[in-house]
Amino acid sequence: FILIAVSGDGSAYEVTQKQPMKLAAMEGLYEGKEGAGLVAVGLLNPKKEAYNDDVNPYLFKIEIPKLLSLMGYRNINAFVPGIKDVIDGGYTLPDGSTALSFQEKRKRGLLAHKALADFQQAKSEGRDTDAANFETIIKDNYSYFGYGFLEKEEDLIPNVPLTFYMFHFMVMVGGYFILFFAVVWYFHSRKKLENFTA
């Protein structure tokens, strides 16, 4: 059961580092904050229709203070970006660089798409110098390649209610298994001890 907790913690850390939008959706976090808490129990507001409207995303929630920052960045005061932050960019990433906006990432993704088409054409025509230049553009923008397939900001946002409730259900089941196996282990150990002393 310790492995379940360690695995869950490691997964939360990796998601935070590599997929901040997924983490924000898992927590229903629209506005990022420092010292972000982990939602233990919450009910999403069905009137929340857009990532940038002023509707409170929760009808109610109970948070464990600062736990999301701790799990995601190993720092209780770390900034955890919300959905709006991931789309707008401008916040500081763990490596010290500034997060790009969705529009900038999309622009770079489209640049990589065009460079790939130009690279293929240059190769087929035997223009090796041009092909090498296009290959450099592709490599420089490769990490944004997928963004070039998206049309608008909302395309980047997963289904928040589905993601939120499924994530919290998974955590609840994981917690249940930890408790269940701890109780079984306790009673099994106690029985062994009683048999040993009898």
PLM regions: where:
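Aromatic-rich transmembrane-lumenal/periplasmic boundary elements in polytopic membrane proteins
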Residues: 2-107
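Hydrophobic alpha-helical transmembrane segments
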Residues: 37-46, 162-173
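Short, surface-exposed loop/turn motifs that are enriched in glycine and acidic residues
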Residues: 57, 155, 171-175
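A general structural signal for well-ordered alpha-helical packing
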Residues: 64, 163-170, 179-183
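Extended, hydrophilic extramembrane loops/domains of integral membrane proteins
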Residues: 100, 108-150, 160
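Short, aromatic-rich amphipathic segments at membrane interfaces
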Residues: 147-170
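Juxtamembrane interface at the cytosolic side of transmembrane helices
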Residues: 172-198
